[in-house]
Amino acid sequence: MFYFPQMLRKLLTLFLIISVGMIPLLSSAETTSPGSLVEKTTLDAKNGLQEAAEQYLIRYRSLSGVDGKSPREDTAAVFIPKGETPKGGWPVVVWTHGTVGVQTTCAPSLNPHSGRDGQYLNTWLSLGFAIVAPDYAGLGSAGLHHYLNARGEAWSVLDSVKAALSAFPLRNQLTLVGQSQGAHAAFASAGYQPDYAPNLHIVSTVLTGVPYFDDKTSAAAIFAGDAGGKEGGDPKIPYAMYIYLSAADTTKGLNVDDYFTPKAAADVSAAREMCIDELTKKVMDDGLNAGNSLKPATQGLLESQTPSLRYSTLKIAHPVFIGTGTQDIDVPTIMQRVFARDVAKAGTSVEMHEYKGLDHTGTMNVSLRDSVPFVLRNLHADAKKH
């Protein structure tokens, strides 16, 4: 495991003492309102974390961010650190996970953590942060998960935090932390929070491997680069399938054969049921890439879906950390650099770190050497302001 020195935890404890009573706790919500708790049970031990003293699965009420109105119930895991609860409650890391699939059984709360994710999350727990880990709408809950739907991610994430704050000894002092799709979900949540969940107090946001779609980039462009190739699998093809499935879920009459070649169409059906690792292996084994999988109409379909992938705003009222591997091909490094530039231009306080030679996965845990001090500095500054 990768843990930080005890001194850092003592420093965090000092920040908590300084800030006790300075940040108001949330009042209990009406039992039928978004963010209200429906059920709290013990999380299956095999899906837990080594550094957690207690771990729970919660079910809570939310609203569908996909259609903007339908009531739903979503799920999240909550991890409580070891040690005595600080006065005022534990500070919170809101962990927004990377791509796992679109089928309900792919939810992180229903599966063991990968070694990478376990190492990362145990580090935050060992530093004295509680973790709220939303599954996202459609994962662990009813309906199809709409991949990279910014509002859909954000509303479910924010409601999970409201529910957790009402049920556990947590401080309304939040750090959003996300990797890959989770970085997208974290930044989307930061953007929607002032209007959708104004009582939540977000101190900072930490992003690694963050996707970005503006009016000059699109999902179509991501897959167009390999359009002429016919050999070799492309690990990004599952994402095109997920975006198609989201479109088909909300648009009647879409026919998979209009958008995918016969070679790929069978895997689109599999994409609804398989989690990401199994689907990616199948795509690679079948040698699927843009050139042999996507029909011309797919580009238009992907273009039509990109508005739902875009962030509501780039101007965030708290500092944002961006960690990028220079060898990231899953979310191209150049896309992340453009994101950092545009977010800073919008007036957000940005701290960006590039990790030479590291890819999408390798960047995540190495970035802790910079993101942990970033988070602690901002907690300290926040305590002084209040």
Positions of the model-derived regions?
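Catalytic-loop region of hydrolases
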Residues: 27-85, 344
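Short beta-strand element of the alpha/beta-hydrolase
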Residues: 77, 88-100
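Gly/Ser-rich "nucleophile elbow"/oxyanion-hole loop immediately N-terminal to the catalytic nucleophile
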Residues: 82-89, 162-179, 197-201
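Alpha/beta-hydrolase active-site loop
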Residues: 147-168
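Gly/Ala-rich beta-loop-alpha elbow adjacent to hydrolase catalytic centers
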Residues: 178-182, 186
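Accessory cap/linker subdomain of secreted extracellular hydrolases
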Residues: 208-313
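C-terminal catalytic histidine-bearing segment of alpha/beta-hydrolase fold enzymes
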Residues: 297, 301-305, 330, 337-386
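Short beta-strand/loop motif that positions the catalytic acidic residue
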Residues: 316, 321-324, 328
